[in-house]
C-alpha cells in the first residue's frame, strides 16, 4: 500500500495530520504479515485514541491533539523477528513524514525492544516488542500521538 504524499501545509491541519498518522500506522501493521505470517491475525486490538482539546488561544480558537492511538497483538516472537521488524520499521518510517527513526537498546537484554519514529513537529509512533520470558507478556504493539493543531474550519476562520 502506497500512502499518498501530503504537503506540509496540509499536515498542519488536525484532520489531515490525523488521517496521515492513522494511514502510516495501519500501512506498517498491514505490511508486517508479508514477512511474518504469524502477525496475520484477527486478534489485533485497535484503539483510535482520544482527542484532547487545548485551552483557547488569543484568537479564541482551540488546538486539538490526538493521543492513545494503538495496535496491540499478543504473540510470541523471537530475537531474530524483533531484529527483522526493526529493519522494516526503519525502512517504512524513514520514507514517511516521521523520518526521525531511532532504536532504544536499553532493555533488549530483558527481551523488550522499542523503536520510535517522530516528525520534526513532534508527532510520534512507537513500536514495542516484548519477547516471552518471566517478566514479559509476549506481544507487539504500536502507539502514536499527534501534537496540537488547529482544525481546518478554525484555520479558515483565522485567515478571514
Label the predicted regions.
Residues 18, 36, 66, 83, ...:
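Mitochondrial intermembrane space
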Residues 42-56, 101-125, 129:
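Ser/Thr-rich, low-complexity intrinsically disordered terminal regions
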Residues 116-160:
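Non-cytosolic coordination micro-motifs
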Residues 1-61:
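N-terminal leader/targeting segments
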Residues 60-112:
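Long, charged/polar, surface-exposed segments that mediate recognition or autoinhibition
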Amino acid at each position: 500500500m502506497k500512502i499518498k504524499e501530503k504537503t506540509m501545509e496540509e499536515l498542519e491541519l488536525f484532520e489531515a495530520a490525523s488521517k496521515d498518522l492513522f494511514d502510516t500506522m495501519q500501512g506498517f501493521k498491514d505490511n508486517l504479515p508479508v514477512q511474518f505470517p504469524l502477525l496475520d491475525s484477527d486478534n489485533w486490538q485497535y484503539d483510535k485514541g482520544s482527542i484532547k482539546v487545548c485551552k483557547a488561544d488569543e484568537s479564541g480558537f482551540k488546538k486539538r491533539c490526538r493521543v492513545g492511538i494503538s495496535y496491540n497483538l499478543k504473540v510470541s516472537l523471537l530475537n531474530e523477528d524483533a531484529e527483522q521488524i526493526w529493519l522494516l520499521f526503519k525502512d517504512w518510517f524513514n520514507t514517511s513524514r516521521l523520518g526521525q527513526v531511532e532504536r532504544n537498546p536499553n532493555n533488549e537484554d530483558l527481551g523488550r525492544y522499542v523503536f520510535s519514529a517522530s516528525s520534526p513537529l513532534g508527532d510520534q509512533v512507537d513500536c514495542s516488542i516484548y519477547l516471552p520470558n518471566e517478566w514479559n507478556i509476549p506481544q507487539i504493539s504500536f502507539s502514536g500521538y499527534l501534537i496540537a493543531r488547529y482544525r481546518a474550519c478554525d484555520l479558515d476562520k483565522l485567515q478571514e
